[in-house]
């Protein structure tokens, strides 16, 4: 549809007449006929707004131009024959001619490189091969890949070898430095030496696997372990004694060890407790390794550690045992248990340390010992009569005091338990000096507990005014750690408390209603 504004042609007469009579042909409500009473209304004329001269000059059809502004290639067929916009050759602008034209009139075209002179001559003569279409010279030619602007660099030729060096060139030709020769010789010697060692070892291994001869290795020290035990046993034999407490109706027997040249002997409390409680009815005697019997006097005893100290007088040339350090004992160390089991004096049994810090409860008929010891566990046999004797290491030093033995039957085999010598030193020194010893206490009683929440010592009751009450420990708290020692049950709690220092703050960790709480408690001395 042509929408151009045509101002040159006159408006049709019928539209002019209709505009003039516009008021006459305007439809009214209820009027179904035209001005002449017809049945149809005449259409409203097309409204053409007035055009000012400036708009007509800017947007009007140019003078002498016919047809629409449609490009020729998309113009309808009826307009194809119009030649209004056919391009014609025109001279270029003088400025463009000067910039892009030939430099001089009549000059030849762009020159070729002299190398291509033959190709140019052949091209002029028509004898050369047909050149492909050049889109730079022929706009109608199709685009194609041509010769690259820069030729690929030619590969470098392989370096010519200088030839192999002979032995004469290497040694006397001066082409290899003497330093390099020395290094090569050293490397060759090292490689040769390593190869010789490997070859020798390989031959020995192969011979060992293939030979039919069997050789047993023997040395002059084949009896060294047995000899070592013999020397250790002999070194401590005279420092071990047998202790006998006898009344008119009964008697008890155990062992002891001499710890001081003045005649002080350490033994277990349960060995002499009956005699200590009834001194008028019992007589205590010490029997030395040579069979000499000497009466003994009680210096002091401690039921809470099951230790006691006796003293013999007027005995010369006593053999004092060497005391070791139980903190250096390790599981697997070889040990000897020395004593008088079943009344057999100077009996030695051998074993190893199988555990450390083993809480072992002690109690027995006829004894006031009711405590827990922090024992060294050993598989060396400790039987009735061994109690109070020393547990010896391979340096002939006392590392413990044999105290208890456990077995599945009445046989001699089983496990033995000894009080560590470091604890024995503290107790013995206090008993020798003061005749008694005090231990730390918290003022609570406990029972063992183990469940999904906690395992330890559950507080059964708390004594009024005790260190535990002052420190905030409550009933039903489960104590899981005392100081630096974990507590697994009530027996271990007893041992852990005994290792605290009286009057010094100690951390106590408890589980209270599922929560871990750390309290500070200052132990008091016990009353006994």
Swiss-Prot record:
Entry EC number(s): 3.4.21.107
Catalytic activity: Acts on substrates that are at least partially unfolded. The cleavage site P1 residue is normally between a pair of hydrophobic residues, such as Val-|-Val
Cytoplasmic side: 1-178
Periplasmic side: 200-528
SMART domains documented for this protein: PDZ
Compositional bias per record (Gly residues), positions renumbered to this chain: 31-40
UniProtKB keywords: Cell inner membrane, Cell membrane, Hydrolase, Membrane, Protease, Serine protease, Transmembrane, Transmembrane helix
Domain called PDZ: residue spans: 426-487
Major subcellular location class: membrane
Region (Disordered): 1-70
Active site positions: 270 (charge relay system), 306 (charge relay system), 387 (charge relay system)
Coiled-coil spans in chain: none
Family assignment from sequence similarity: Belongs to the peptidase S1C family.
Entry protein name: Probable serine protease HtrA1
Organism: Mycobacterium tuberculosis (strain ATCC 25618 / H37Rv)
Lineage: Bacteria, Bacillati, Actinomycetota, Actinomycetes, Mycobacteriales
């Amino acid at each position: 549809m042509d929408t151009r504004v045509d101002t040159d042609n006159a408006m049709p007469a019928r539209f002019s007449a209709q505009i003039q009579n516009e008021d006459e042909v305007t439809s009214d409500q209820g009027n179904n006929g035209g001005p002449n009473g017809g049945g149809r209304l005449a259409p409203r004329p097309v409204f053409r707004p007035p055009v000012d001269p400036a708009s007509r000059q800017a947007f009007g059809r140019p003078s002498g131009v016919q047809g629409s502004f449609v490009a020729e290639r998309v113009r309808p067929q009826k307009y194809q024959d119009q030649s209004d916009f056919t391009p014609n050759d025109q001279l270029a602008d003088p400025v463009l001619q000067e910039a892009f034209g030939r430099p001089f009139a009549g000059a030849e075209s762009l020159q070729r490189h002299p190398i291509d002179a033959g190709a140019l001559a052949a091209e002029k003569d028509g004898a050369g091969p047909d050149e492909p279409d050049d889109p730079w010279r022929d706009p109608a030619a199709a685009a194609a890949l041509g010769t690259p602007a820069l030729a690929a660099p030619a590969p470098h030729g392989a370096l010519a070898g200088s030839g192999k060096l002979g032995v004469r060139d290497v040694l006397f030709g001066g082409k290899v430095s003497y330093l390099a020769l020395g290094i090569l010789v050293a490397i060759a010697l090292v490689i040769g030496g390593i190869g010789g060692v490997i070859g020798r070892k390989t031959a020995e291994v192969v011979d060992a696997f293939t030979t039919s001869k069997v050789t047993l290795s023997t040395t002059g020290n084949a009896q060294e372990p047995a000899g070592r035990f013999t020397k250790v046993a002999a070194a401590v034999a005279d420092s071990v004694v047998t202790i006998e407490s006898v009344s008119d109706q009964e008697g008890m027997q155990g062992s002891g060890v001499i710890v001081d040249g003045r005649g002080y002997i350490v033994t277990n409390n349960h060995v002499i407790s009956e005699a200590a409680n009834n001194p008028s009815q019992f007589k205590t005697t010490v029997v030395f390794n040579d069979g000499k019997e000497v009466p003994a006097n009680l210096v002091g005893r401690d039921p809470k550690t099951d230790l006691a100290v006796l003293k013999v007088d007027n005995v010369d040339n006593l053999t004092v045992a060497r005391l070791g350090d139980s903190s250096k004992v390790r599981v697997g160390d070889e040990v000897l248990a020395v004593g008088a089991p079943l009344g057999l004096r100077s009996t030695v049994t051998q074993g190893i340390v199988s555990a450390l810090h083993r809480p072992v409860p002690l109690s027995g008929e006829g004894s006031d010992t009711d405590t827990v010891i922090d024992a060294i566990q050993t598989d060396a046999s400790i039987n009735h009569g061994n109690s109070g004797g020393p547990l010896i290491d391979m340096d002939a030093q006392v590392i413990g005091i044999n105290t208890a033995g456990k077995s599945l039957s009445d046989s001699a085999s089983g496990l033995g338990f000894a009080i560590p010598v470091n604890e024995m030193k503290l107790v013995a020194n206090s008993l020798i000096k003061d005749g008694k010893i005090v231990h730390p206490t918290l003022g609570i009683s406990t029972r063992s507990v183990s469940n999904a929440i906690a395992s330890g010592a559950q507080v059964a009751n708390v004594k009024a005014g005790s260190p535990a009450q002052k420190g905030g420990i409550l009933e039903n708290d489960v104590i899981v750690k005392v100081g630096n020692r974990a507590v697994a049950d009530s027996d271990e709690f007893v041992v852990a408390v005994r290792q605290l220092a009286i009057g010094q703050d100690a951390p106590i960790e408890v589980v209270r209603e599922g929560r871990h709480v750390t309290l500070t408690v200052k132990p008091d001395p016990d009353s006994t």
